[in-house]
């Protein structure tokens, strides 16, 4: 069974999101736990400062950055828009 850990930075950004985005995140988190490569998530590996991390889509603009810490244990490191995360 997969487990998710939340980084403090993720928690701070998540707290600032709208209720609508939080609902979308919860739905996508369920998809992630069922199949992290579900096509709706658009999961892909990252490069540069996020080398070793992956990302999935919550909405068209909001993404979650995460990495697998151990087998089936995932650290959600950050959440935000493309410019917030990658600029």
What residue ranges belong to the model's regions?
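Enriched for short, Lys/Arg-rich terminal
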Residues: 1-4, 8-23, 58-63, 67-87
């Amino acid at each position: 069974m997969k487990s998710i850990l939340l980084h403090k930075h993720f928690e701070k950004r998540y707290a600032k999101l709208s209720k609508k985005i939080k609902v979308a995140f919860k739905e996508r988190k369920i998809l992630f736990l069922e199949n992290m490569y579900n096509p709706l998530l658009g999961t892909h590996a990252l490069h540069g400062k996020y080398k070793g991390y992956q990302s999935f889509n919550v909405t068209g603009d909001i993404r979650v950055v995460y990495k697998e810490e151990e087998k089936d244990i995932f650290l959600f490191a950050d959440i935000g828009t493309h410019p917030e995360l990658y600029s």
